[in-house]
Amino acid sequence: MTRTGREAAPPARCDVRPWAGAWNPHTLTNVAQNRSDDAAASPDAAPSGPSRIDGVDAARAIAVFGMFTVHLGVDSMGLLSPEGYAWTLHGQVRGNSSALFALLAGLSLALMTGRTEPVTGDAHRSAAVRVLTRALLIGLLGILLDLTGVPVAIILTYYAGFFVLALPLTRLRSGALWAVAGVLAVLGPPLSFLLRDTVVDPEPRTSSLSSLTEFLLTGYYPAITFMAFVAAGLAVGRTDLRSTGVRLRLLAAGAGLTVFAYGGSWLLLHPLGGLDRLVEEGTAFMGGFPIAPGMDPVLLAQLREGVMEEAESISGQVPTDSWWWLAVNTPHTGTTFEIAEAVGQALIVLVACMWLAERARWLMYPLASVGRMPLTVYTGHILVLMVIVAGDAAEWRQPWLLEWFVLGALVLATVWRLVAGRGPAEAGLAAAADGAVEIVEERRRAP
C-alpha cells in the first residue's frame, strides 16, 4: 500500500513545520517530501531526488474514494442528486477504482524495487522480504476486516496475493512488463472463460476470499484479470515519472487504450452482431429469443437493453454461456476491453494528478495526504461501516454519507500528515518490514 524509491538510507526527519517562519505557498509539500515517511524505504542506494511524487499519492486517494462510492452506494450521495447523476458516478468508478488501486500497487512495487532500474542481489533480497512481509500483514488485516461482517468485497486479501505473484516481475524492465500486461489482458479473459466453463466447479461466492479458485478465477477481484493491472503499474513505475515526455506518452497510451476499448467492444456488439447473438442464445436472466426479419423494433430494443443491463450487473467475470460475453466492456467483467479501458483511464487519472499536484500543491495537499495512508483510510472506513451496520443498517443509505466519509478522510489524513507524517497502519507495516529484513540479514551473517 505504500511505496518508495531505490534502496536508500532513510533521510533525517525534517522538523520544520509549515507554520514556522515566513509562509511559503509550497512549504507543506516541500516539508512532506523531505520527511522520511516513505513506508517502503530501503537502505542500499540513495535516490537522486524527493522519494515521493504527490500526484501518485493523489491518484491513490481517488482510487480509495472510488471504492468508498461503490461500497456506500448511490443512496449515500447528496451532492449528485437527483439519482441519475449518482448512478453515472457510480457506474464510472465501479471497477475502475479497484483497477486503479491495483495499477498503483504495481507502481508502488516498482518504486520499492529500484524505480527505473530493477535492484539485484542483496538489494533485491531485502526488497523481496519487505514486500512479502507487507503481503502477509495486509492479507491478515483483510481477513480481520472480513470478519467484521460489513457486506462489501474486501480487496486487501486479494491485494496481498497480487504482491506475492508480482515478485518475479520486479526483476523486469518497463518494456518487458508492458508485454506481460498485454499478454495477460489478451489471453487472461478467454483462459478464464475456458477454465470456468470446463474445469472449475461453480461454487457460492461471498464477500470474503475463501479459496484459491476464488483468488485466481471466480472472486470479485480475480488474479487472472487484476495481475494485468499490477503488471501495467510495474511498467509505469519503471519509467521516469518526473519526465514530461514520459507523462505525455502515458497520456497518449491511456487515451488510445480507452478508444480501443470502447470502439472495439461497440464494433463487435453492434455492427458485427454480438449483442443480437447474446439475445438469441439467452442469458442467465432471460431465455433465448430468436431474432427474425421484421421483428418489432421496440421489442428488439428491450431485449438488447436487457442483455446490457445484465452485463452492467456482472461482478468479477462474465458468464460462460456464450463466448460473445467477451466482447462486452462493462465494469468488473474481466474482458480484454474492460482491462484496456480501466488501464487507459488509470493512466489518464495518474497523469492528471501529477500535473495538478505540481501546479496546485496546496489544493492537492489533502488529497495526497489520503494517498499517503491508503491502508489506514481504507481500514478506517470499513470499521466505521461496521459501527453503522451494527447500530442501524438503514443509516448506511442516508444521503450525504459519502460526502461525510470523503471529507472526514481528507481532514483527518491532512492533520495526521502534518503532525505525525506517516499513517499509523503504514508505520506499522514499515516497522514490521524493516524488522523482517534485519532478522534475515542477521541469520545470513550468523556462522
Which residues fall in each region the model found?
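Alpha-helical transmembrane segments and their immediate juxtamembrane cytosolic regions
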Residues: 13, 25-447
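Basic polycationic patches enriched in arginine
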Residues: 3-6, 13, 17, 35
